[in-house]
């Protein structure tokens, strides 16, 4: 993971935490345990970082929902 994708992941953790009224550490655990960080956010950074924050937050929520994780 390079600096840019790392910063993006941190930003998205905080954006999701704000949107879902959760603390960032809980969101990190959800994303890490579901594989969202390593299998979605980092590999698709080039596309995702060009999208709006709300769009990516919704996309992450959908990713988690498909895997049976409720936020």
Question: Predicted regions: what is each one?
Answer:
Residues 1-71:
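C-terminal alpha-helical interaction appendages
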């Amino acid at each position: 993971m390079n600096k840019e994708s790392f910063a993006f992941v941190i930003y998205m953790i905080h954006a999701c935490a704000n949107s879902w009224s959760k603390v960032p550490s809980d969101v990190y655990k959800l994303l890490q345990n579901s594989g969202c960080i390593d299998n979605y956010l980092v590999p698709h950074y080039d596309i995702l970082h060009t999208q709006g924050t709300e769009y990516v937050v919704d996309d992450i929520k959908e990713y988690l929902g498909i895997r049976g994780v409720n936020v």
